[in-house]
Amino acid sequence: EETIRFVIGPDNAVIADLSEELPGKGIRLLGYRGTLEESLRDGTFIRLFVKDRLDDEPFISASFLDKIESQLMDKVLGLIGLARRAGAVLNGFSKVESSLKSGKCELLLTASDGAEDGRMKMTRLAEAVQCQQVTFLPSARLSMALGQTNVIHASIIGSGWAQRLNASIDRLSLYVNGHEAA
């Protein structure tokens, strides 16, 4: 999904409706942070709301764009945690290596701050079995999502979980990096 829906809350604050469940008409804009920054800067964003409303101008907090990124990251971390609780995540070098070699790994998560030699070994293995690898979370974030300590490698072993997680990661990447991520 390349767009983000925005609605006005009861306090007249603009809210990013990432779950697409909030009531109200709302507006949709491309979900690129750069595009949103520009539309906030030049006033386009507010004008889109004001043209449909006769009351007060909507309020946008100073941390609005950061909150969207944080919500998108929370969605990714939450899905990793849910997958773990569903038994669809293996972690630890040997378990992940084994899941790659057996073809069970649908998505490889590697901590961005893991040791270079371990990351490269996993990368080579993932490429050999054509398993997608994601390397943008630091170990602390990956560990937190999995309720463990020092997690460097994790294997998503359910294709449904891998697809859901990939979609959330893609949405976050698109928001942060814009169309270059696509």
Task: Give the ranges of each region predicted by the language model.
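Charged phosphate-binding loop/patch that engages nucleotide di/tri-phosphates or the phosphate backbone
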Residues: 167-182
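Active-site cofactor/cluster-binding pocket
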Residues: 86, 98, 104-105, 116-126, ...
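N-terminal cysteine/histidine-rich coordination modules
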Residues: 1-48
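Short basic, glycine-rich beta-strand/loop surfaces that mediate nucleic-acid
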Residues: 128-171
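Extended interfacial segments that mediate partner engagement and assembly in macromolecular machines
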Residues: 34-109
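Short glycine-rich anion-binding loops that position phosphate/pyrophosphate groups of nucleotides
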Residues: 34-35, 113-115, 159-161
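Positively charged, polar, low-complexity stretches
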Residues: 16, 20, 37, 51, ...
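Short active-site oxyanion
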Residues: 25-26, 86-87, 105-107, 129-132, ...
